[in-house]
Amino acid sequence: MDIINIAWAALMVIFTFSLSLVVWGRSGL
């Protein structure tokens, strides 16, 4: 496992999570 691949995967997970959290918050739940 390359450290760059791990960092990129973690960045994608955090970005997807925060994006879905913003969408979930805007839908009023």
UniProtKB/Swiss-Prot annotation:
Keyword Cell inner membrane: no
Transmembrane portions of the chain: 3-23
Domain of life: Eukaryota
Membrane topology reported for the UniProt record: Single-pass membrane protein
Locations listed in the record: Plastid, Chloroplast thylakoid membrane
Alphabetized UniProt keyword annotations: Chloroplast, Electron transport, Membrane, Photosynthesis, Plastid, Thylakoid, Transmembrane, Transmembrane helix, Transport
GO biological process, one term: photosynthesis
GO MF annotation: an example: electron transporter, transferring electrons within cytochrome b6/f complex of photosystem II activity
Subunit and interaction comment: The 4 large subunits of the cytochrome b6-f complex are cytochrome b6, subunit IV (17 kDa polypeptide, PetD), cytochrome f and the Rieske protein, while the 4 small subunits are PetG, PetL, PetM and PetN. The complex functions as a dimer.
Name of this chain's protein: Cytochrome b6-f complex subunit 8
Gene: petN
